[in-house]
């Protein structure tokens, strides 16, 4: 599969109108949600997560659950550890969604389905035997021979598009974190700078520990006893699991810490 986060690149060109319609977070979640099956302990079959029917049976329910977790547990916590200039610029866009509103859930469902469709279309042209590959026979032909291993056009397209997509996403993230909107007063924050740094470190350390734990929980022969590509895939999945679990667990802890802060509680009750 292309790197899961690379799929977000398909959403980037439409980020402004999506943000205007409050669809951005749901569409980003949707663009990655078919791959969430790889993060589950029981690993559902690909047809259960990457098919037209899976849009309704897997992508939509899992995407809506992820949307709730993001809005309720992750969004505000992550906002509070951002640098001041990024926090000031993104805060108007980071208002919690009205999770009691039917309209909000309809919009979230549309965003998730739209994002998931971009994922399935991308995969259709980058996986051997997929529908898009069957439509373009050249993608099913060998194009490169590496150490006696023939690399098909679809696989080459998968690797190249994954790297390009990942680069696009990283550039957008770095640009968003570094861009300065001009001189402005430093915002009043619920967390002091040193405490923000501690929480950022907590995210990183927790993700690393959990990724290592998920990796060692598998039999060594299942991780290292196959090809290099298979080994990299297992490491990538363990890393994704660790990052996802850390994002949820640490954000829950930070949310509890923030709710105990009178300033944060008063500020959020007024917005």
Task: Write out the residue ranges for each language-model feature.
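N-terminal membrane-targeting hydrophobic helices
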Residues: 1-271
